[in-house]
């Protein structure tokens, strides 16, 4: 079986560098392309330069040329860039791994639509530990059920542009679904001033942006007399990058939209 040919979008960013490291150290996959904006100083340089590696792949801004020799594209950029890459992947019938967060409903619909033609793994978090945490949260919510106040606290580095994180929102969805609630109507995002007593049917979110925090998430279930806290802390972006490469290998030639629960056999 030939190696899986992967293209990395946003290769000069924090996740892009981690993805290149993951691809170049994983048997059975090869780096087939590395994409950046046309104005990036990395264009024309070896994609491994920021890592002190020699990959033999030059950074390019030519999406069509990169996809012409690819099996899948891995994208952890921003919604507007992801949707442009999505359109290109549809044209070239190239599968896509999407770790970008912050999509509106229209963006999510575009991804679902593309899943009718190509294979897509779209997930808010590619960490194995986080996806196990989703299962633990489902169990906790069903067992604790009513009478517990639920709060989700997340922390990320100062450069993250969306809040709450996609992972925090997914955690909220998992808990809300387990309780038979709609997160859109029960979520409370931040509190300020005189808010009155807590509505027992709500799920609260608190966001921290500071320093170089890779990603911390805690879901708190609290009732008079006890608290249950389920926490995941990431210390390296390689955790997410390795998960994304694993997802690409699992996806193979499949068509349709999947997430990491499918990849890990947790669904």
Swiss-Prot record:
The keyword NADP applies. Pathway: Amino-acid biosynthesis; L-lysine biosynthesis via DAP pathway; (S)-tetrahydrodipicolinate from L-aspartate: step 4/4. GO terms for cellular component: cytosol. It comes from the Bacteria. GO terms for biological process: diaminopimelate biosynthetic process; lysine biosynthetic process via diaminopimelate. Pfam families: DapB_C (PF05173), DapB_N (PF01113). Coiled coil: none annotated. NADP(+) binds at residue 37. (S)-2,3,4,5-tetrahydrodipicolinate binds at residues 157, 166-167. One of its GO terms (molecular function) is oxidoreductase activity, acting on CH or CH2 groups, NAD or NADP as acceptor. Its EC number is 1.17.1.8. This is 4-hydroxy-tetrahydrodipicolinate reductase.
